[in-house]
Amino acid sequence: MKNVLSIAGSDCSAGAGIQADLKTFVANGVYGMTVITSLTAQNPQKVKMVEDVSIEMLRNQLEAILDVIEVSAIKIGMINSKENAELIYDSLLKYKVKNIVLDPIMISTSGKSLIKDETKDFLVNKLFKLVDIITPNLDETTEIVKMILNNENIENIDSVEKMQSYGKIIADFTKKWVLIKGGHLSNNAVDILLNSDETYILEGEKIPNNKTHGTGCSLSSAIASNLAKEYSMLDSVKKAKNFVLCSIKNSIDFGEIGGTVNQMGEIYKNIDIEKLY
């Protein structure tokens, strides 16, 4: 079994963050481990508080795993502190881990900023160029392009063509794969996977509900799982999209505040848990 590491924030409601990552790893047949960058007090409706772990704690977590355990892929999620981002960057260089997926979490599903401005600059200009694939949503894509072009007047994305254009700007700047997540754009779940030379428009079924907390985290973790299992980048993304679709179809309903995706839902359909133990 391959080992996959999530470097991300903790979500106490377990819909997103490292909790979503661990459930995704289990559902995709890899062994999941975590390095926590921040503690968040949040639910599908709002983020109440974000508190970064100390640089000492982050360093010791990274060393505890990477010094002694072979890691086949890494998923990176929320990094709020620039100091922590710098340490993660240095650690990736030191340990030379392959198959790094970066979900540049800047804005929560509920619309709250999750990252400091100084950290955004470091991510875009340094960390982006060290990973294998970046998976921004539409708002994050626009924000990243504004930073790359140093132009605050960039229009928001309102078409697949603009998704592709902005994605190409990021891909050319980073020389890496980019997956633009366009789930909020149209009636279809249209994502665009591209690098400097290749472009793939990936369409899928869209489930219209408000129980989608954790979709981005689950997608990036599933991509990392598939890369660890030696699938190509295109196949890793396609399989991850199908996994997230199943997780949405089996989502957990919390009532008025919406709900969260259920990464284990499809597995539970095919296994009688009560007969296992």
Task: Describe each PLM feature range.
Residues K2-S6, V26-T109, I267-K269:
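Conserved N-terminal subdomain of the carbohydrate kinase-like
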Residues A8-S13, Y200-G214:
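Short pre-catalytic strand/loop immediately N-terminal to key active-site residues, enriched for Gly-Thr
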Residues Q19, T142-E143, N209-M233:
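Short, small-residue alpha-helix embedded
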Residues G29-M33, T199, N226-A240:
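Phosphate-handling active-site elements
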Residues M49-D52, L234-Y277:
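Charged C-terminal helix
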Residues E86-K94, K176, V190, E198, ...:
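Nucleotide and nucleotide-moiety/phosphate-recognizing core
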Residues D117-T199:
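Conserved phosphate/ATP/ADP-binding segment of small-molecule kinases
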